[in-house]
């Protein structure tokens, strides 16, 4: 058993928690910007890249989350600053590709319904809060599944 396998639960837990708190760290240090991707231009760019890459790696190892994983990695690789159109297409594809795995759940179906409500957040309060809402739903879902499976394995 290698080191990653040995600490799989702890690593995944850390990645999920970092992805959930990242937007709030970004906002508390750099203020509120138009979208999470706008923090690419901030001093916290390394955090943005590392958390997205780690989340993408986590998604890639999770059933039904390979496509969102690829889109998350691509939107991170193509910065908003240098490739705005490509970045925005990949960002849109990422958020849209998360719908299918959430709506086809056998357990915890309410996460899919909560995720669909994100369109109201977008219309009512804007892109940044839409993205944060989606990240919170995704993080909460993956945290719930991680803990559920961990407890089953005990």
Predicted ranges, named:
Residues 1-5, 32-34, 60-63, 80-82, ...:
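Juxtamembrane membrane-water interface segments of multi-pass membrane proteins
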Residues 12, 16, 66-69, 91, ...:
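Residues within membrane-spanning alpha-helices of integral membrane proteins
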Residues 22-27, 59, 72-78, 101, ...:
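Membrane-embedded alpha-helices of multi-pass membrane proteins, especially ion channels
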Residues 28-32, 77-83, 121-129:
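Juxtamembrane "helix-exit" motif on the non-cytosolic side of transmembrane helices
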Residues 109-154:
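Terminal transmembrane helical module of multi-pass membrane proteins
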Residues 1-62:
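N-terminal topogenic module of multi-pass integral membrane proteins
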Residues 65-113:
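Membrane-proximal helix-loop-helix units in multi-pass membrane proteins
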Residues 20, 48-59, 94-107, 134-149:
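Hydrophobic cores of alpha-helical transmembrane segments in multi-pass inner/ER membrane proteins
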């Amino acid at each position: 058993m290698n080191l990653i396998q040995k600490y799989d639960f702890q690593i995944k837990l850390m990645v999920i928690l970092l992805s959930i708190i990242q937007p709030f760290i970004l906002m508390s240090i750099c203020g509120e910007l138009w979208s999470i991707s706008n923090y690419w231009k901030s001093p916290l760019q390394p955090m943005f890249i590392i958390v997205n890459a780690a989340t993408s790696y986590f998604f890639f190892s999770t059933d039904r989350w390979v496509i969102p994983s690829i889109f998350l990695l691509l939107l991170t690789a193509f910065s908003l600053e240098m490739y705005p159109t490509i970045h925005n297409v990949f960002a849109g594809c990422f958020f849209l590709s998360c719908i299918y795995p959430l709506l086809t759940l056998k357990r915890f179906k309410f996460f899919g319904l909560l995720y669909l409500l994100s369109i109201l957040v977008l219309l009512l309060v804007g892109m940044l809060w839409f993205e944060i809402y989606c990240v919170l739903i995704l993080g909460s879902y993956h945290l719930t599944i991680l803990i559920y499976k961990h407890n089953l394995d005990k």
